[in-house]
């Protein structure tokens, strides 16, 4: 086997040739291949490295040949030109980055498990844990914080209280106050009498009625918009973990500990007591009581899977 290497200031190309005249081109960054100064030509910036091995004529390794530190987009202002890449090289880069995405998601899952172990201090086994890891929903109402299941109930209570107060004020309090209209201090009833209109109209003040009806309509509309927003966000959540990203551990029944029972090897005629079973931390969930949801990969979103269209937009 004979191999030649031509070094450029940014990348090295290694050409492998075998007796079967099969050739393959591998790319390495400049830090992977440093030629000896004695091999450099004085009149050119390129270096030539040749080696021969007649006993080993194995084909070049097939698979992911992309270096770990290879990055097309290094920053917000630095983007390498990948138009010159060959088809096989593009496929290798896509496969490498897909694997990197799921490895990073697995790292996030393990970090969140450790965070849960160190942050939880006291757990009441009789009552269920609050969904603190439930992702917050952006509110559609301006100047309101993100919506959670707890704040949504508070929003319902506040809206019902406001609507009830407005109706009570417009229907009972305002008619008894004898609100005045105009500059002459004429009451609304006198104003109706002067126009020779039915006296039933004087029982309802149009100003109070319009303000009360408008306020009730605005509050009801905002509540309907918020409820619709919550329903739309719930459709985007994972159907298995309900947006938490975790499922109860089946090995320890979501308790975080499991029994450690060693096999008994004592003879039957012995008078020694049997060893009492002890508990230990569950190795499956690391004591957290929850494991990663395999459907959403700990993200809580229904589209986060291996077949996510964001990963393969042209398939």
Curated annotation (Swiss-Prot):
The keyword Cell cycle does not apply. Belongs to the orange-like family. CXXCXXXG motif repeats lie at residues 249-256, 293-300. Interacts with PSY1. It comes from Arabidopsis thaliana. This is Protein ORANGE-LIKE, chloroplastic. The chain crosses the membrane at residues 155-175, 207-227. One of its GO terms (biological process) is protein stabilization. It is found in: Plastid, Chloroplast membrane. One of its GO terms (cellular component) is chloroplast membrane. Changing residue 97 to H: No effect on the accumulation of carotenoids. May be associated with accumulation of carotenoids in chromoplasts. The keyword DNA-binding does not apply.
